Amino acid sequence: PMNAFMVWSCGERRKLAQQNPSMQNTEISKQLGYRWKSLTEAEKRPFFQEAQRLKTL
C-alpha cells in the first residue's frame, strides 16, 4: 500500500514535471522530498488519512 508521501507525491510529481519538462526524474524525486519535509503536520494530515484509508481496502 502507498504511504502518505506516495499519495501526496503522485499529484505533485505530475505538476513538477509539467512545470520543469527538462528536469530529470532523480531531481524531481529530490525536490519532492524537500517539499514534503517543508509541509506542516496539518498540511500532511489528509495524505496520512488517505494512506490509512487505502491500507484498509
From Swiss-Prot:
Function according to Swiss-Prot or TrEMBL: Transcriptional regulator that controls a genetic switch in male development. It is necessary and sufficient for initiating male sex determination by directing the development of supporting cell precursors (pre-Sertoli cells) as Sertoli rather than granulosa cells. Involved in different aspects of gene regulation including promoter activation or repression. Binds to the DNA consensus sequence 5'-[AT]AACAA[AT]-3'. SRY HMG box recognizes DNA by partial intercalation in the minor groove and promotes DNA bending. Also involved in pre-mRNA splicing.
Name used for this protein in its record: Sex-determining region Y protein
Keyword Repressor included in the entry's annotation: yes
InterPro entries noted in UniProt: HMG_box_dom, HMG_box_dom_sf, SRY-related_HMG-box_TF-like
Record's GO cellular component terms: cytoplasm; nuclear speck; nucleus
Family from the record: Belongs to the SRY family.
Molecular functions per Gene Ontology: calmodulin binding; DNA-binding transcription activator activity, RNA polymerase II-specific; RNA polymerase II cis-regulatory region sequence-specific DNA binding
Entry coiled-coil feature ranges: none
Subunit structure: Interacts with CALM, EP300, HDAC3, KPNB1, ZNF208 isoform KRAB-O, PARP1, SLC9A3R2 and WT1. The interaction with EP300 modulates its DNA-binding activity. The interaction with KPNB1 is sensitive to dissociation by Ran in the GTP-bound form. Interaction with PARP1 impaired its DNA-binding activity.
Entry-linked SUPFAM superfamilies: HMG-box
Gene that specifies this protein: SRY
Domain of life the protein comes from: Eukaryota
Protein keywords: Activator, Calmodulin-binding, Cytoplasm, Differentiation, DNA-binding, Nucleus, Repressor, Sexual differentiation, Transcription, Transcription regulation
One of the protein's GO biological processes: cell differentiation
Ranges of the DNA-binding region feature: 1-57
Location in or out of the cell: Nucleus speckle; Cytoplasm; Nucleus
